[in-house]
Amino acid sequence: TSHPEVTEKAKEIRPEWVLKVTGIVNKRPDKNVKQDTLNGDVELEVTNIEILNKAETSPIDVTTEGYEIGEEHRLKYRYFDLRRSRMQKNIRNRHKVVKFIRDYLDKENFIEVETPILTKSTPEGARDYIVPSRLWQGTFYALPQSPQQYKQLLMAAGTEKYFQIARCMRDEDTRGDRQPEFTQLDLEMSFVEREDVMALNETLLIDIVKKLYPGKKIQEIPFPRISYKEAMEKYGTDRPDFRKNKEDKNSLAFCWIVDFPFFERTDKSDNAQTEGEWTFTHNPFSRPQNEYIEMLMNKKDIGNILTTQYDVVLNGSEIGGGSIRNHEPEALKKVFEIMGYPSERIEKNFGHMLHALGSGCPPHGGIAWGFDRLMMLLENEPNIREVIAFPKTGEGKDLMMGSPAPITDKQLKELGIKLVK
């Protein structure tokens, strides 16, 4: 080389150092052109190297796919782990899918509305994360498990078409492939029936695959539909995997599950939120199918009432679920009565919903996608942590930041909290 000092400097450079390289771009001689390489027809004649920052020895190897490295190490040094090309691809593709969804729904006249993160504890199927109030000692906010009530209140407010890329929090027991905080595509529409919501979501999913994942093939369009009863009888699950070839990484088998029972007996439920005899299977705000509304209003034959709920399943994983909602306050009230809620509790927990529905609220319905799970399946990853920038462990720990962590005695005192040993 004509720059021996550059050669000497290059010898001291180690992996992951940050450099500023100055040079002259030259056209390669024909015999040296690399045909299948980006910029393979040029080469850089380096005239100077400036070291901007040195790096300590990397605690993990970032030149491999990373699956062979213990996950605790990968999560502890996530800022290193994210440098590997596979993780860069996952995070960048996630951005592309979010942008595609936003652009698509914008064209369909949806508006994105941010709903509160500090809200009120209400039963939605899992434990709430609780946030103590310093100004109002002895009272607590809850972090939202979903924007369910807010999006319905937006329908009462005349928003008509709402969506949000929503952060949701659920305080669940240790489960390998669950995250305490996760992302949903949440949407709600006024003046719709079940078919309208399902058609919009089916088209959006098909377009995401066709435009952003052209190498993948959707097995069947339109998506097949199967009733909950048939799914349980035939496959023993309400998340059947319809792929003809499960070895084919590019095969996507979507299906809709419909005709769910509205209620199940409390003693048969995994997460009953009531001391009553009955609890909801999916969502207390769902509307029954038209032929079952009278049964709901009369509180008769409760176990046979079918809801307008629809779940979308991909390759054996539920990636979304929604329903048409009860837009009449009396119908919603009956749901809580069937669940054994006394009228004072209904008014205290859901009075705002009943008043909003009674204010002239249009019929409405919507859906929420488990966005992390969808990305995991599109990227052929083994778990959702591979498509989240900074995930927590199955036990809900952030190994990089060291949370959850104790707070100071001063903070506890300000909040009026005493720890019981």
Please annotate each region the language model reported.
Residues 1-421:
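Class II aminoacyl-tRNA synthetase catalytic cores and aaRS-like
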